[in-house]
A protein has these predicted regions:
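Non-catalytic substrate-recognition and accessory regions of acyl/acetyltransferase enzymes
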Residues: 1-92, 96-124, 128-179
Length: 179
């Protein structure tokens, strides 16, 4: 989105393919948009497309809380298939908010309903640090490190999803009212 050549395929996906992928139950796309001004359409400033997936951790990551599952070659995951932010809004936490949405969907809805241990993505090389800041880990296999778009994963069971522990939220009393 915006003039960056690396992101042109991401922009064309949103305008040309996202709806058909969603209609065919291949991927669901969520957009971040600014409200419409003076009768114009809302302005899309970012989007994320999610799909069901699995991740082969190559024996490099063991589940400590479910050792028996370690015998399986892959684990259930939700995949960030596409993530894009308009160039005018990079650095303004739009991408972070969209990744947070994916985490919330995986942890609060998908995981408890059908089982989903990981959030995964095939990261563009220049986006690896973005995903690392979001808590993702680069899969440490030689094959993965040689890929143009290496696999990164986030173990949803390792997250502290208790809102009471979020320093960005105001403290609350036991009855839920602000402190």
């Amino acid at each position: 989105m915006g003039p960056d050549l690396d992101f042109r395929p991401l922009k064309s996906f949103l305008t040309q393919h996202a709806l058909s992928y969603q209609s065919a139950n291949v991927a669901v796309t969520y957009v971040a948009a600014l409200p419409a001004i003076q009768g114009e359409r809302p302005r899309v400033i970012g989007y994320i497309s999610l799909t069901c997936s699995e991740v082969d951790l190559g024996g490099m990551y063991a589940l400590e809380d479910c050792q028996h599952a370690n015998r399986y070659p892959s684990m259930p995951a939700l995949k960030i298939a596409r993530l894009a932010c308009h160039s005018d809004y990079r650095g303004r936490r739009v991408g972070e908010a969209l990744v947070d949405l994916a985490i919330a969907l995986a942890a609060d809805h998908i995981g408890p309903t059908v089982g989903c241990r990981f959030l995964v993505t095939d990261s563009k090389a220049r986006s690896v640090s973005f995903y690392e800041r979001a808590g993702f880990t680069l899969l440490e296999t030689e094959e993965n490190q040689a890929r143009a778009e290496p696999v990164m994963f986030l173990d949803l069971n390792k997250l502290d999803l208790d809102p009471a522990n979020d320093p960005a939220l105001p403290a609350q009393t036991a009855d839920g009212t602000p402190d």
